[in-house]
């Protein structure tokens, strides 16, 4: 389910339980609606999973399902409105919906793997689709997170290529930044700085040798990195306890929260003010 937690860590609301297999990306639009991507498909041997996964769901602030993108339980081929392990979702300045589609690109050398941005109208009709698996400009190896900057540019955490890509709203490549390490998630603070979470650089073997997992804070104006919140601990297990912030958010008071994957499950930790 989706959990709403207050500043003291208390769960104050819960919704969406049983609707999703792997709730992955989360976006709250200006109206308070909650968008969630379900980045996994059903296990054919588990009948309880039938018809679930491969979708993006829009919830009202109270948890009512308002819209579904994709077809539940059906994996798309990267060309139409049917999605395939969608990673993340963001609503653009004009109300269009942008989905980072394809979670498996970083784990394969198959160029047919889905790795794209799918653009939908506000009522869920596919408008356009761009990108493919690869490492060139406008190509992706897992578009793991998406969001818009203050200029209306689409920022993509192209995790498998260890970079942020900046695109316009029609998918045209503008620039890239590799100094934010291997990005799993991003958030813009009220100060205009971008906060980028790296959850994988300490894996063994490392997909990003020489880099330390954590949260890098900087500017997309000049690409500078001003601060680093260390997420590493001793050892190089895939999911070491207390490390690897895969999600990041900043509240109005400037507190930084890391969503941490660990052996015991997951947790949210306030890591800096």
Residue ranges: model-predicted function:
Residues 1-273:
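Sequence-structural signature of mature extracellular/luminal beta-sheet repeat domains
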């Amino acid at each position: 389910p989706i959990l709403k937690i207050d500043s003291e860590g208390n769960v104050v609301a819960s919704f969406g339980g049983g609707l999703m297999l792997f709730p992955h990306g989360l976006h709250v639009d200006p109206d308070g609606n909650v968008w969630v991507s379900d980045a996994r498909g059903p296990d054919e041997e588990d009948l309880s999973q039938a018809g679930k996964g491969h979708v993006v769901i829009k919830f009202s602030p109270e948890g009512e399902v308002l819209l579904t993108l994709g077809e539940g339980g059906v994996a798309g081929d990267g060309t139409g409105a049917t999605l395939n392990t969608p990673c993340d979702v963001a609503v653009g300045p004009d109300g269009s919906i942008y989905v980072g589609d394809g979670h498996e690109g970083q784990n394969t050398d198959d160029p047919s793997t889905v790795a794209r941005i799918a653009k939908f109208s506000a009522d869920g009709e596919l408008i356009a689709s761009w990108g493919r698996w690869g490492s060139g400009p406008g190509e992706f190896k897992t578009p793991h997170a998406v969001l818009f900057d203050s200029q209306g540019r689409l920022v993509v955490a192209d995790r498998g290529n260890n970079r942020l890509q900046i695109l316009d709203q029609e998918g045209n490549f503008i620039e890239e930044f590799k100094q934010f390490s291997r990005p799993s998630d991003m958030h813009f603070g009220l100060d205009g700085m971008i906060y980028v979470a790296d959850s994988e650089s300490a894996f063994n073997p490392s997909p990003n040798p020489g880099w330390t997992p954590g949260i890098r804070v900087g500017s997309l104006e000049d690409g500078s990195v001003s601060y680093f919140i260390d997420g590493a601990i001793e050892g190089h297990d895939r999911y070491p306890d207390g490390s690897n912030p895969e999600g990041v958010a900043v509240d109005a008071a400037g507190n930084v929260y890391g969503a941490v994957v660990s052996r015991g499950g997951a947790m949210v930790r306030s890591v800096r003010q």
